[in-house]
C-alpha cells in the first residue's frame, strides 16, 4: 500500500515536471527561436556525418551557412518587439541583446566561407570544425541574452570549450598544442575567478541570481557600498577581462593567434569580444549600478594599458598574426571607452557601431592572410614584400583593411573611431580620448609599414615566397575571396552610411 502511494506521488511529480518543461518550451521557446535554428542545424550535421559513408562536404557547408542565415532572418523579424524575460528570469530578449547576437551571427556567417579552402588544403576534419563553430555561436548568443549569474557563467563556458578545441585543431602542430595549453589553463583560472566574484555578489544581495533582483537585494540588505561589492567587482572584472583580452589580461592572445589555424583566429578575434562586451555592459550597468565610479576607474586603467601596450608592442612584431593579436588588444581599449560612457552620451551606440566596422576590417584582413598563406605557406610580415607585383587585388584589399583598422579617412574605421572618441569627449573622458588618438597614430605607422612592403617593387626586397607566387584559378578560393570582398567593401563604406547605422545602434539601448 505504501509502495503504491509512493509510486503515485512519483508519477504525479514527474508529470508536473514534464508539464512545466513543456510549458517553458511552448511559451518561452519562441523567444530563443534563432538559437533553436542553430541547434537544429547541429543535429542535421551530426545525422549526415553519422549516416553518410563519404562526407558530402558541400552539403555540410550549405547546412551550416543556411542555419546561420535563417537565424539572422529570425532575429531581424523579431526586431523592435517588446523586451521579454523568459525561462524563469534566466534569459532576456531586447534590442540591445539582439544587436550583439546579430553581430555574432554575422561573424560566424563570414567565417565559414573563409574557412572552406583552408580546411580542404590542410585536410582538417570538416564536420567537427563546423560543429564547434555553431556551438560556440550558440554559447555566445545565450551569453548576450543571459539575465542571471548561472547563465552568465555557463554560456561563456560553452563558448570557451569550443574555443579551446578549435585553437588546438591542428594536433600535429607544436605551436598549436602550446597555445591551446596556455589558453586552457588561463581560461580555467579566469572562470574560477569569475565564479568567485559571482559568489560575493550572490551573498551580498541576500541570495539573488537575477541581475535586476541583485540590485533590489543589495538595497534591501544595505550592502551596495560594502567591501564585499568591491571584492566582487575586482574578481568579476578580472574574469571578464580574460574574454575581452585587454592588458594586462592579454598574455594568452599572441600565442593563441600565432599557434591556432588562421580561420579559427579570425573567428575568435571577433566573436569572443562581441559576446564579452555584451555581457560586460549588462553586468557593470545593472548589478554594479551603485559602484559606477569604481568600475569606471577600473575600466579606464584597462583601456589606457590596452591602447598603449597593444599598439607599442605591435610595432616590434615580425609575424602577421602576432601583430594583429597586439593590434586587437589596442582595439579593445577603444571599445572600453564606449562601455565607460554608457547610455548617457551614446556610448553604447558608438561601441556597437565601431564593433560592426571592426568585424569587417578584422575579418577582411584575416581573409587576405588566409589567401596569402595558402599560396605561399608563410605568415611573416617581411614575406609580403612585393605582393602588389604578383597579386594587385589581394595587396589592395589587405591595404584597405589595414588602413581602415588604423582609422584613416574616408574609410569606415575613421568614422567609427571619430564617433567613439566624440562620445568619450562629450562624457568628459579627455585623457582616454587623447591617448586613443595618439595610439591610433602609432597604429597607422605599423600598418603603413606593412603597406609599404606590399607595394615595393625592388627585387632585392622581394622574398622567394612572393617571387614564386602563383595565383590560383578563378574558380578556386572563390569562397575566401567572397568573404574578403564583402569585408573590404564594408571596411571602405564612406560616411554617407553612418547615419542609418548610428540610428539603428541608438535604437538598441535598453
Swiss-Prot record:
E.C. number: 7.1.1.-
Full protein name: NAD(P)H-quinone oxidoreductase subunit 2 A, chloroplastic
Organism (species): Helianthus annuus
Residues passing through the membrane, by range: 24-44, 57-77, 99-119, 124-144, 149-169, 183-203, 227-247, 295-315, 323-343, 354-374, 395-415, 418-438, 484-504
Organism ancestry: Eukaryota, Viridiplantae, Streptophyta, Embryophyta, Tracheophyta
Top-rank taxon, per record: Eukaryota
Pfam families in the cross-refs: Ndh2_N (PF19530), Proton_antipo_M (PF00361)
Family, as annotated: Belongs to the complex I subunit 2 family.
Subcellular compartments: Plastid, Chloroplast thylakoid membrane
Primary localization class, coarse: plastid
UniProt cross-references to PANTHER family, sorted A to Z: NADH DEHYDROGENASE
GO cellular component: chloroplast thylakoid membrane
UniProt keyword Oxidoreductase present: no
Keywords, in A-Z order: Chloroplast, Membrane, NAD, NADP, Plastid, Plastoquinone, Quinone, Thylakoid, Translocase, Transmembrane, Transmembrane helix, Transport
Amino acid at each position: 500500500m505504501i509502495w503504491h502511494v509512493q509510486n503515485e506521488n512519483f508519477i504525479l511529480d514527474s508529470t508536473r515536471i514534464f508539464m512545466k518543461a513543456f510549458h517553458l518550451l511552448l511559451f518561452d521557446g519562441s523567444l530563443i527561436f534563432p538559437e533553436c535554428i542553430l541547434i537544429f542545424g547541429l543535429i542535421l550535421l551530426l545525422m549526415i556525418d553519422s549516416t553518410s559513408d563519404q562526407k558530402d562536404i558541400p552539403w555540410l557547408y550549405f547546412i551550416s551557412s543556411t542555419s546561420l542565415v535563417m537565424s539572422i532572418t529570425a532575429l531581424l523579424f523579431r526586431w523592435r518587439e517588446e523586451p521579454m524575460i523568459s525561462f524563469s528570469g534566466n534569459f532576456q530578449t531586447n534590442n540591445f541583446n539582439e544587436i550583439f547576437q546579430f553581430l555574432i551571427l554575422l561573424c560566424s556567417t563570414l567565417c565559414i566561407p573563409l574557412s572552406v579552402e583552408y580546411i580542404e588544403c590542410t585536410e582538417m576534419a570538416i564536420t567537427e570544425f563546423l560543429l564547434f563553430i555553431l556551438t560556440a555561436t550558440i554559447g555566445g548568443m545565450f551569453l548576450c541574452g543571459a539575465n542571471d549569474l548561472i547563465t552568465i557563467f555557463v554560456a561563456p563556458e560553452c563558448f570557451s570549450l569550443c574555443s579551446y578545441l578549435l585553437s588546438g585543431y591542428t594536433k600535429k602542430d607544436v605551436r598549436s598544442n602550446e597555445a591551446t595549453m596556455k589558453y586552457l589553463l588561463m581560461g580555467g583560472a579566469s572562470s574560477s575567478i569569475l565564479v568567485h566574484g559571482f559568489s560575493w555578489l550572490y551573498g551580498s544581495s541576500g541570495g539573488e541570481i537575477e541581475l535586476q533582483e541583485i540590485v533590489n537585494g543589495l538595497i534591501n540588505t544595505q550592502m551596495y557600498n560594502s567591501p564585499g561589492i568591491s571584492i566582487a567587482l575586482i574578481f568579476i572584472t578580472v574574469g571578464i577581462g580574460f574574454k575581452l583580452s585587454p592588458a594586462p589580461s592579454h598574455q594568452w592572445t599572441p600565442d593563441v593567434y600565432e599557434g591556432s589555424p588562421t580561420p579559427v583566429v579570425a573567428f575568435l578575434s571577433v566573436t569572443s569580444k562581441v559576446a564579452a562586451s555584451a555581457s560586460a555592459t549588462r553586468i557593470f550597468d545593472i548589478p554594479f549600478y551603485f559602484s559606477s565610479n569604481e568600475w569606471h576607474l577600473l575600466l579606464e586603467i584597462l583601456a589606457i594599458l590596452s591602447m598603449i601596450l597593444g599598439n607599442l608592442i605591435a610595432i616590434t612584431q615580425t609575424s602577421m598574426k602576432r601583430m594583429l593579436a597586439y593590434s586587437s588588444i589596442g582595439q579593445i581599449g577603444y571599445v572600453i571607452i564606449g562601455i565607460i560612457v554608457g547610455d548617457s552620451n551614446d556610448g553604447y551606440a558608438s561601441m556597437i557601431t565601431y564593433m560592426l566596422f571592426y568585424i569587417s576590417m578584422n575579418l577582411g584582413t584575416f581573409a587576405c592572410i588566409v589567401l596569402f598563406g595558402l599560396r605561399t605557406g608563410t605568415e611573416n610580415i617581411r614575406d609580403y614584400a612585393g605582393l602588389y607585383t604578383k597579386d594587385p587585388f589581394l595587396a589592395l584589399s589587405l591595404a584597405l583593411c589595414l588602413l581602415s583598422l588604423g582609422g584613416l579617412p574616408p574609410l569606415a574605421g575613421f568614422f567609427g573611431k571619430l564617433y567613439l572618441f566624440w562620445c568619450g569627449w562629450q562624457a568628459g573622458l579627455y585623457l582616454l580620448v587623447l591617448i586613443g588618438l595618439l595610439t591610433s597614430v602609432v597604429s597607422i605607422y605599423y600598418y603603413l609599414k606593412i603597406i609599404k612592403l606590399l607595394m615595393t617593387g625592388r627585387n632585392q626586397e622581394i622574398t622567394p615566397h612572393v617571387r614564386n607566387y602563383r595565383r590560383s584559378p578563378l574558380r578556386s578560393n572563390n569562397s575566401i575571396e567572397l568573404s574578403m570582398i564583402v569585408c573590404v567593401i564594408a571596411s571602405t563604406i564612406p560616411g554617407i552610411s553612418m547615419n542609418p547605422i548610428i540610428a539603428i545602434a541608438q535604437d538598441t539601448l535598453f
